[in-house]
């Protein structure tokens, strides 16, 4: 499902000149640590260190559209897509390195994101081969993932990057955030998914304005926002 809506490698992976990689997902980490799992998948397939990878903040307008984060489907959808995107990127960049050095693909090995010609000191990195940071080719779903017998990260002991902050109390949950001029909001749920907002009660709008409650409308999406949470809930 995820690859149908987001078929390009660049929808999932972005190489940065600094030697880092961003991975994109449409799944939200709400405590299940999917972010750590997705980082490990990409790191395993691309032979780079997990600390070289960051998960891009999820944004409606730019992140892959993967629908809801429900039903334990994040690995099935986003995990699969990132694995295939990473395997495709590895194959494409290995082929480019082989062409660059004029050697067979079989003579290229990968260590920490560097494509090295066997028995030589010749090497080139993923980041040198992707100077604009993007791979605009389609994800190849037939690209073979790394054989599990060669896994160096998956299935092995790994502490997720945010775990230390969680167990020591330094981690900030969304309920802990207090920002300047922050508003609390509640979405007004329609009776069914395909409902269309036809009109709004003008008297209700006047009442909201008098109580300094903001109404947010985008098409059939409707929400209220207020300076305190109780007013928004009420």
Task: Please provide the spans of the model-predicted regions.
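Cofactor-binding beta-sheet edge motifs in enzyme active sites
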Residues: 1-234
